[in-house]
């Protein structure tokens, strides 16, 4: 069974309204031993002036977030290991990279999730990313962005939700399949292993044609290449989704050959048995 969920969001992220204490209470009620928040640091959005619901996304209040999270980390220390993290939306612009490096240095999050949200000038989460583009073109563009992000100059621990572009894709078969993108996926997986990063299994798959991202075919290839470090992420933005599909993910990982999760914690990799 999985007792660690380290990629979630609260009201400090623009797409959540959840109170952090409520999220922690839910994690405790579920019997989690390790719980983490990794709020959005959307400096990739800034350059593109992207909007959500017709409004530009405001920058996170870094000081307020870390202050509140560290207060709760101390308050819940006897109930679970609460990790205070950050999700960096990769962008190659010097301004974004400098801001991420500054955040990592100033606040020293317990862990950092590296992710791709923006591609071809937009957030590839939304259906319009597919408009006028073939699946091959749209997914390749996204995957090569993932590959580029692995060489980010800032420190990071986890490679997030590979297949993010498929979450709301409008193709008849939206699933990101290893066999269709083998070359670039192999390059990604090999680099994750070479850099000793952690591959995230994210259960916020929406309508991607998969119960989690990446799906078992990609996870099996990662294992075959020697990858052993995986983490679990519900990507919950409200308490009801914390730990979602953890039984399904646990069984899938064990069927491939994985025996444990890897938890990033202040520069160390902790082991949590499946």
Predicted regions and their residues:
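Charged catalytic cores and adjacent phosphate/nucleic-acid-binding surfaces used
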Residues: 1-10, 20, 31, 120, ...
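An N-terminally biased module of ancient metal coordination in phosphate/nucleic-acid-related enzymes
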Residues: 1-95, 168-179, 238-244, 249-255
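Histidine (H) residue identity feature
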Residues: 7-9, 40, 49, 92, ...
């Amino acid at each position: 069974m999985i007792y660690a969920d380290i990629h979630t969001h609260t009201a400090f992220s623009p797409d959540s309204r959840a109170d952090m204490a409520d999220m922690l209470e839910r994690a405790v009620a579920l019997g989690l031993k390790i719980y983490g928040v990794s709020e959005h640091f959307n400096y990739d959005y800034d350059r593109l002036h992207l909007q959500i619901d017709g409004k530009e996304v405001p920058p996170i209040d870094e000081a307020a977030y870390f202050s509140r999270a560290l207060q709760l980390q101390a308050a819940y220390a006897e109930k679970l290991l609460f990790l205070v993290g950050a999700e960096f939306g990769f962008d190659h612009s010097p301004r974004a990279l400098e801001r991420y490096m500054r955040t990592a240095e100033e606040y020293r999050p317990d862990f950092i999730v590296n992710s791709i949200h923006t591609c071809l000038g937009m957030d590839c989460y939304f259906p319009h990313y597919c408009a006028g583009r073939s699946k091959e073109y749209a997914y390749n563009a996204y995957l090569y962005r993932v590959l580029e992000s692995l060489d980010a100059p800032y420190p990071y621990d986890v490679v997030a939700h590979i297949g993010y572009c498929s979450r709301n894709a409008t193709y008849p078969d939206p699933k990101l399949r290893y066999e269709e993108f083998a070359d670039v996926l192999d390059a990604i997986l090999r680099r994750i292993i070479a850099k000793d990063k952690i591959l995230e299994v994210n259960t916020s798959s929406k309508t991607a044609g998969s119960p989690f991202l990446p799906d078992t075919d990609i996870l099996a290839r990662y294992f075959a290449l020697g990858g052993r470090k995986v983490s679990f992420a519900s990507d919950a933005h409200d308490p009801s989704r914390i730990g979602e599909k953890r039984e399904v993910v646990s069984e899938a990982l064990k069927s491939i050959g994985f025996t444990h999760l890897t938890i990033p914690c202040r520069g160390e990799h902790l082991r949590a048995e499946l």
